[in-house]
Amino acid sequence: LVLTIGYLISEAESIWLTSSLGGAVPGHVLGYDQETGFGLVQALGRLSVPAIEMGTRIRVGAGDKVILAAEGGRRHAVAATVVARQEFAGYWEYLLDRAIFTAPAHPFWGGAALIGGDGSLIGIGSLHVQHSNGRELRRDVNMVVPIDLLPPILDDLLTYGRPNRPPRPWLGLYAAEVEDAIVVAGLSDRGPASKTGLKPGDRILAVRDEPVASLAAFWRRVWASGPAGSEVVLQVARDKETMKVRIPSTDRTRMMKAPRLH
């Protein structure tokens, strides 16, 4: 069983797993969780490599020494330091309460293993971003999804291919913080928001009657509207006009190819 970051395998038509020892075996997408970003791949052949233990009991904090290891063996492993544990809001309707940020940034971060001092797996590499603690210039870091988010959903991923809970409402809306405002940065062609008249550049003021001052607050208010299928009402400013936009949300997973071997 291989744990990776989901965007590498979502809607994949074929998967091959290779090791630094050589050889390759086919793989199958076993599960993908939209909320954490974790993806599971089942090897359809024997992998001649040892498994790594999950470090779910380790407290990971700023200053911890870690290793970020990508494919390719030791030559693609980078000694790093945890520079922060903090909230991360992504423009694509994504939010982590306590993401792990490490530096220096690994050039091959996607799906890389974050390994703690005891040799256990403490996270999976997701992004290359810029980070500032407010006292220094912004620097390149990797954002890592913490491993402790996996155990609560692992059985569901193995059984159903996704967490067995009501899915969050998905709008198909890309948003960003610009000068203390939440701005529509783009719209997914297949998403429900693209059919409502929203345009890039529109400023989002509130979800229903609840003002939103940050991207994280915006996503939380959207998800508080109910499960997928719920209507999400936005107050939006365009030029000098304010208007309400009603978006019939959907389940994002329905828009994607799903695992078929369950």
Give the role of each language-model region:
Residues L1-A77, A99, F108, D180, ...:
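Conserved active-site neighborhood of the chymotrypsin/trypsin-like protease fold
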Residues T4-G6, A12, S19, A70, ...:
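Sec/Tat-exported extracytoplasmic proteins
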Residues T4, G27, V41, G63-L68, ...:
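Terminal peptide-recognition signature
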Residues P104-F108, A112-A113, L171-A206, E210-A213:
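PDZ/PDZ-like domain segments forming the peptide/carboxylate-binding groove
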Residues R74-T81, G134, P211-F218:
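Short, Lys/Arg- and Gly-enriched loop/turn segments at beta-strand edges
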Residues G27, V49, L68, R75, ...:
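C-terminal cap/linker of serine protease catalytic domains
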Residues H28, D155-R162, V183, R190, ...:
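PDZ-domain C-terminal substructure recognizer with occasional recognition of PDZ-binding tails
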Residues L44-I52, A77-D140, P169, E177, ...:
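Active-site region of chymotrypsin-like
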